[in-house]
Design a protein with these regions (language model features):
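Hydrolase catalytic cores
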Residues: 8, 28, 32-33, 57, ...
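Catalytic-core regions of hydrolytic enzymes
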Residues: 36-56, 67-70
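Catalytic-core segments of hydrolase enzymes
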Residues: 56-157
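Sec-exported extracytoplasmic/periplasmic mature domains
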Residues: 9-13, 23, 49-57, 64, ...
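Extracytoplasmic/periplasmic, Sec-exported soluble proteins
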Residues: 36-43, 71-75, 116, 162, ...
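Subtilisin-like serine protease catalytic core
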Residues: 1-41, 118-120, 130-131, 139-143
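Extracytoplasmic/secreted envelope proteins and their assembly/folding machinery
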Residues: 2-9, 44-48, 77-80, 121-124, ...
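Terminal peptide-recognition signature
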Residues: 4, 18, 59, 83, ...
Length: 183
């Protein structure tokens, strides 16, 4: 989370560390990951609702996965619908599995709602410094929205340090930062 927050909103031009994309953006940190394993879907749904009820314009979720039990998907789908109603953009990075998401379903996704596709939902994969998709990223002609820079991104790190990060999380943070400039 620290590196993503730095990509999005680190103070610009202060001579320290890195420059965030939208340094006027406010970060609302909500922990939904238990530390090991996958995030609890109930906690994800509650965090989405909390964020939109407290003014979040952009929500950056953890990576998609295929482990959403059917009975629990509705919790997240309903929370995403609430975010859509309140005008919040939801950004989710893909997993690094080299899987065609048009053939294998990953969650959350824009088609989770039975009453139609979500219009506020963006799925992001990582590209390299030349703009090419990274080799192990998931892909999909209809399920992936865009590729964004996600390799060797210099950002804040724990303990008042800085380092380079690579992955879908860096790409999705880049998109969230640009979205914050537009909002």
């Amino acid at each position: 989370g620290v590196m993503k927050a730095g990509v999005i909103a680190a103070k610009r031009d202060n001579g320290v560390g890195s420059n965030g994309i939208a340094d006027n953006a406010e970060i609302m940190t909500l922990r939904i990951h238990p530390g090991e394993g996958e995030p609890y879907l109930k906690d994800m749904a509650l965090a989405i609702r909390y964020a939109v009820n407290h003014g979040a314009d952009i929500i950056l979720l953890p990576e998609q996965n295929s482990l959403y039990p059917e009975e629990q998907r509705q919790w997240v789908a309903d929370a995403l619908k609430e975010a859509e109603k309140k005008g919040a953009l939801v950004i989710v990075p893909v997993w690094d599995l080299s899987v065609d998401m048009d053939k294998d379903e990953f969650f959350p996704n824009r088609k989770m709602r039975k009453d139609g596709e979500l219009t506020n939902f963006m799925v992001v994969a990582s590209s390299d410094k030349n703009g090419n998709p990274v080799l192990n990223t998931n892909y999909g002609a209809t399920t992936l929205d865009l590729y964004a820079p996600g390799t060797d991104i210099y950002s804040s790190y724990m303990g008042d340090t800085y380092q380079k990060g690579t992955g879908e999380g860096m790409a999705s943070a880049t998109v969230a930062g640009v979205a914050a400039l537009v909002k």
